[in-house]
């Protein structure tokens, strides 16, 4: 009988200790979360990009993911964001995520949107986004960043993405015969992007070249092909168009992020006769407002 009472007392004491332990843990969690504020973060695609895709068959590809990473006041990843997190949503409807942040501290919030890990690697964080090893030129990608904390502590944050890449389109003013091999070389390009600083990283040794062999004729006043590059826009570049081995240089082209460059001219005879190419710079990527630079 004594043993049974002793066992009962021991069980009750153990239950009381467990209850106290759980209460302490709960109180610690409350204390840890004291002062944190829930914040809903929304990211929208650039509206001009959506317009381009809706009206142009050769528009940009649709992104399939948007990543977020939050940095502390020392530019180090916040706990839980050592690697970028995936936001909910789609390109058409935008992306969202709700987080809890300390309003007394300043946070740097980084965003990166692309078509997935087959195109860009983000394992080292959004300060070191890199192209996939098998790519010769980068794929479509968007970026944004914002600061939250201090005097900016709203319960909702909205950011609009911009293109991290520059898009280059070759446009012909004459019919181009099938079978031609065309290429465009950009001498100064990069293979990565630092979202926090908003600039490309890891310069290539020989630039980037995109080549295409035409399977069919390209009609007059049509786009021949497009591709993307990561470039810093620090200085204008001389691009080289090669037409079945014959070269044409296109000078004074400002290749930089969030800019669509349209190289326009007689592609059929480029490099074989004197051909003038015009570089039309679409700074809003899809708008009708362009800056024209003649070669």
Give each language-model segment a name.
Residues 2-8, 17-295:
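Sec-type signal peptide cleavage vicinity
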């Amino acid at each position: 009988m004594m043993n049974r009472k002793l066992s009962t007392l021991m069980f009750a004491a153990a239950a009381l200790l467990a209850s106290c332990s759980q209460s302490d843990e709960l109180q610690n969690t409350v204390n840890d979360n004291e002062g944190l504020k829930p914040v809903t973060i929304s990211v929208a695609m650039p509206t001009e990009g959506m317009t381009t895709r809706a009206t142009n068959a050769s528009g940009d590809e649709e992104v399939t993911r948007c990543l977020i990473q939050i940095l502390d006041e020392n530019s180090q990843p916040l706990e839980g964001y050592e690697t970028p997190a995936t936001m909910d949503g789609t390109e058409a409807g935008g992306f969202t995520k709700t987080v809890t942040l300390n309003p007394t501290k300043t946070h740097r919030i980084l965003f990166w949107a692309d078509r997935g890990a087959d195109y860009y690697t983000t394992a080292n964080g959004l300060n070191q986004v890199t192209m996939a090893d098998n790519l010769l030129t980068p794929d479509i990608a968007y970026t944004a960043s914002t600061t939250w904390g201090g005097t900016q502590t709203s319960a909702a944050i909205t950011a609009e993405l911009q293109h991290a890449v520059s898009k280059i389109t070759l446009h012909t003013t004459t019919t181009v015969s099938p079978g031609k091999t065309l290429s465009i070389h950009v001498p100064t390009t990069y293979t990565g992007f630092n979202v926090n600083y908003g600039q490309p990283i890891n310069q290539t040794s020989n630039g980037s070249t995109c080549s295409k062999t035409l399977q069919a004729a390209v009609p007059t006043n049509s786009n021949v092909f497009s591709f993307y590059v990561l470039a810093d826009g620090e200085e204008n570049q001389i691009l080289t168009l090669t037409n079945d081995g014959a070269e044409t240089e296109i000078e004074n082209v400002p290749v930089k992020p969030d800019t669509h460059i349209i190289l326009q001219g007689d592609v059929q005879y480029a490099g074989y006769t004197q051909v003038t190419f015009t570089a039309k710079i679409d700074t809003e990527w899809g708008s009708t407002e362009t800056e024209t630079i003649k070669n």
